[in-house]
């Protein structure tokens, strides 16, 4: 009896051992399959950046993890990297890497002329128009569509270049005009003094305004002050002689009867003197000489600056001459009363 249980125990042990072995073998086969399925996933992590356009590689990876055999639409290729190691990547069979490159479409002159005419008419040709145009030119609709896309891109680039060129040309023209104006302003001489002078510019006034110099300015200042004092004295002198001498220089400038003051004034003034701005020339000469003597011009200044300053002083003295005459009269009256 004890032998039978021993045989049964051996059988049970053998059955359990066989079950264990089969279970271990099944587990090992599963681990091997899992390792085979996870191996391409590790390899696909790096090259997916280079082949990001093939979205079917993810499907291949999923199907590979589920089954040990590759699906029909996936294939394996071996790639050697820069370090020399060989890597296995899975790519979809639809991605034909061995196919030749697409040849560029060559249009005839007639086709280009017709396409250009249609583009000038309308930049977007779609629908029946594109179908009819492709049929007439013996082209495909895709070729016509791509040609119009390229033509629109070229036009945009040309317009951008033209706008940049126009801006550069306008800036250059503006700069040149500004430089030309500055050059003209630098070379422009001050306004001519002979145009401002009366016909009697050959007298003492013209010589004083044309050729300024320090000794001449000093002499003119002395003569002007003496003439102004004499004119004031003649204006304040009582009697018909004073009245005649007061109005006589403004009319003709000829010497008339009166005291020595007016006679000396007419002797020092030119015989043919004309009025400027309805004012007597001797009084104008005196005011100009006094203003020039109050602020003498230096010889170190440029000739253009001196002429411009002289013209400005000449105009200012002419404008304010009546006020200076009244001031001289008031001063002379005060001196006479004292």
Swiss-Prot record:
GO cellular component: nucleus
Cell compartment(s), UniProt: Nucleus
One BP term from GO: brain development
Keywords recorded for this protein, A-Z: Developmental protein, DNA-binding, Homeobox, Nucleus, Transcription, Transcription regulation
RNA-binding listed as a keyword: no
Bias (Basic and acidic residues): 1-34, 327-338
SMART domains per UniProt: HOX (SM00389)
Compositional bias annotation for Low complexity: 239-252
Pfam families in UniProt: Homeodomain
GO MF annotation: an example: DNA-binding transcription factor activity
Principal location class: nucleus
Region annotation Disordered: where it falls in the sequence: 1-69, 239-269, 318-338
Matches recorded under CDD domains: homeodomain
DNA-binding region: 100-159
Function: Transcription factor that may function in dorsoventral specification of the forebrain. Required for axon guidance and major tract formation in the developing forebrain. May contribute to the differentiation of the neuroretina, pigmented epithelium and optic stalk.
Family membership noted in the UniProt record: Belongs to the EMX homeobox family.
Name the UniProt record assigns to this protein: Ventral anterior homeobox 1
Organism (species): Mus musculus
Species classification: Eukaryota, Metazoa, Chordata, Craniata, Vertebrata
Gene giving rise to this polypeptide: Vax1
């Amino acid at each position: 009896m004890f032998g039978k249980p021993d045989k049964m125990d051996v059988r049970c042990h053998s059955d359990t051992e066989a079950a264990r072995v089969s279970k271990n073998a099944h587990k090992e086969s599963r681990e091997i399959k899992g390792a085979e399925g996870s191996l391409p996933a590790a390899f696909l992590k790096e090259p997916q950046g280079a082949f990001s356009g093939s979205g079917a590689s993810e499907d291949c990876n999923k199907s590979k993890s589920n089954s040990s055999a590759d699906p029909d639409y996936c294939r394996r290729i071996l790639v050697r990297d820069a370090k020399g190691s060989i890597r296995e990547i899975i790519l979809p069979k639809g991605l034909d890497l061995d196919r030749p490159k697409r040849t560029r479409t060559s249009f005839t002159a007639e086709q280009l002329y017709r396409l250009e005419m249609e583009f000038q008419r309308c930049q977007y040709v779609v629908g029946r128009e594109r179908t009819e145009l492709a049929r007439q030119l013996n082209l495909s609709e895709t070729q016509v569509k791509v040609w119009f896309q390229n033509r629109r891109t070229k036009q945009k680039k040309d317009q951008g270049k033209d706008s940049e060129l126009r801006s550069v040309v306008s800036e250059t023209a503006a700069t040149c005009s500004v430089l030309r104006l500055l050059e003209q302003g630098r070379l422009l001489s001050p306004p001519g003094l002979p145009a401002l002078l009366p016909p009697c510019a050959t007298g003492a006034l013209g010589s004083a305004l044309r050729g300024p110099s320090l000794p001449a300015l000093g002499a003119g200042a002395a003569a002007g002050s003496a003439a102004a004092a004499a004119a004031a004295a003649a204006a304040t002198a009582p009697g018909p002689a004073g009245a005649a001498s007061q109005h006589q220089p403004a009319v003709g400038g000829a010497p008339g009867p009166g005291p020595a003051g007016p006679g000396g004034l007419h002797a020092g003034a030119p015989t043919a003197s004309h009025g400027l701005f309805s004012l007597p020339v001797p009084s104008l000469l005196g005011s100009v000489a006094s203003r020039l003597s109050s602020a003498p011009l230096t010889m170190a200044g440029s000739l253009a600056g001196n002429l411009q300053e002289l013209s400005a002083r000449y105009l200012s003295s002419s404008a304010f001459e009546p006020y200076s005459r009244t001031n001289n009269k008031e001063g002379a009256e005060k001196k006479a009363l004292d």
